[in-house]
């Protein structure tokens, strides 16, 4: 029997980042007391310069950071990616940072396709709890995702009205109260 390739798994999880490599076969495991499908992956990148001081040639690999990422589910079973991100240390300024990917925002544990699916569900008359249950996140997380998206699209409004305003039509009533 042939196992799935990295490309097949990447397509199923809607992953475009080629720097994420699947390291072993997926397994069914208990995550937060629920039997879940877990994929195992590693993220490494060739980084030339320190993100803090900008010096080249002073970076050393410094182990991995392991996270459980909520991934798109192909069934009703929760799906996660156990992602090991490469850590780097700058010998010049002693700063430590982790490899980044567009698949998951920095300091976030939810994959971008899941965030997009959550946002698309909000267009329908569905409660936050139901959306959270469907995508294996809390209702508070759903609300936070909605708020973050709204903040990105919020246009800055002026604090004062303009000095001159024009009206096409104006209707007045005789009642003054």
Language model features with spans:
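Short, conserved DNA-binding cores of transcription-related domains
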Residues: 1-101
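Short glycine/proline-enriched turns and hinge-like loops at secondary-structure junctions
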Residues: 33-34, 175-177
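Short, positively charged, Gly/Tyr-enriched micro-motifs
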Residues: 68-176
